[in-house]
């Protein structure tokens, strides 16, 4: 593939923009709390946008179009169900979790929250949460790799 001038200029502008955003964020970050949660000063719109983008990245861009392509428009119920589930999560869980994370030693992660919430001095709940999270991450990456390899190849070599 030949490198064209517009492609090179676009790439350089993109890299410069990313470095600039990183520098501005670095200057406004004073401690680990600022880094991990934005100093708890992000508004509900930014928080919802960030959580939604993190949650929906893989299934929205790969899974949902693939399901609709293979099975037809009847699979659009997936988007409706997931949107409804996210809304219920924000209504029932998010506010209470925000309050409880501050009460439980200013927990910054879900394992830290469970450790503080259940007064786990041996960190059993935190360890268990981390193990489940890592297994889920491995399965997520494996699923992405299978999608990248291609369904025919994956079915032939990995699924039988």
UniProtKB/Swiss-Prot annotation:
Q: Molecular function (GO) terms listed?
A: L-proline transmembrane transporter activity; proline:sodium symporter activity
Matching InterPro entries: Na/Glc_symporter_sf, Na/solute_symporter, Sodium:Solute_Symporter
**Compartments in which it is found:** Cell inner membrane
What Pfam family is a match for this entry?
A: SSF
State the annotated membrane topology for this chain: Multi-pass membrane protein
Record flagged with keyword Cell membrane: yes
Single Gene Ontology BP term? Answer: proline transport
**What GO CC terms are in its UniProt record?**
plasma membrane
Q: Note whether Amino-acid biosynthesis occurs among the keywords.
A: no
Q: Where are the transmembrane segments?
A: 6-26, 68-88
Q: Tell me what reaction this enzyme catalyses.
A: L-proline(in) + Na(+)(in) = L-proline(out) + Na(+)(out)
Q: Give the top-rank taxon of the lineage listed in the UniProt record for this protein.
A: Bacteria
**Name this polypeptide is given:** Sodium/proline symporter
């Amino acid at each position: 593939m030949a490198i064209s001038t517009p492609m090179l200029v676009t790439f350089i502008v993109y890299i410069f923009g990313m470095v600039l955003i990183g520098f501005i964020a670095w200057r406004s970050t004073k401690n680990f709390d600022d880094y991990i949660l934005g100093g708890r000063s992000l508004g509900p719109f930014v928080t919802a946008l960030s959580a939604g983008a993190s949650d929906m990245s893989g299934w929205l861009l790969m899974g949902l179009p693939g399901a609709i392509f293979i099975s037809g428009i009847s699979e659009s119920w997936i988007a409706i169900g997931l949107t409804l589930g996210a809304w219920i999560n924000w209504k029932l869980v998010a506010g209470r979790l925000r309050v409880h994370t501050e009460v439980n030693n200013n927990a910054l992660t879900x394992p830290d929250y469970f450790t503080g919430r259940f007064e786990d001095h041996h960190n059993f709940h935190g360890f268990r949460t981390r193990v489940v999270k890592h297994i889920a991450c491995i399965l997520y990456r494996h699923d992405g790799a299978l999608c990248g390899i291609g369904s025919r190849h994956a079915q032939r070599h990995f699924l039988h």
